Amino acid sequence: MKKLLTFLLVSMLLVFCALPAGAATRWELGAAEREKLDTFFSNFAEARIGSFVVNNEIPMETFVQFGVQHNLINRNYDLVNLDINHSGVKKEAVEAAVYKYFGQRINAVSTSQYKLENGLFAVLKLGGESVRFAQIEDWNSTGKDAWVGIVNVYSASSGFTSVHGTPEEWKREDPQDIPELVARFMFTVTRSPSDADRYVLVDWLEMR
């Protein structure tokens, strides 16, 4: 699997560097579009999911990790309080998140990291974790309702909110609290099957 992902990453890099004229069009994004895409990709960055490609079956581990973490971070109002240290994420909420962001319907099951019991995935409650977010670097249309590009993933201290800022702005705001670039990913997205105004993630390959 690792060798295959490395091969695909190299292939995608070659494609980016040698696209024939007209094969893809680089889009210049306005501020509102950029922030919308930053928010979309931040959902994957904060869930800390690893590389995957559409031509391989996306592991259930990836789907469940995304669904659990997405709900834990963004939908705490829908969590079930299990005990002082643990929350329960509903199975149907995990499946809904996967469909919304990947466009795939799944039947969520237990994984090595998260156990499903009585319709809930038990997970440790959040408490002072670092913030992860993404910013779009490159956005290209293939002309076939698919887009490819690159996002940068940053890590910042708990409570950091200037997720759409630039390094220059961060330095001015607080020189002691500048987000760290921790990863870069190449991606492919397509239109959502349920909402033409939304995207779903197809490929997600870390650049090493």
Where on the chain are the PLM-derived regions?
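A broad structural signal for short, well-ordered beta-strand segments within beta-sheet-rich domains
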Residues: L126-E137, L201-E206
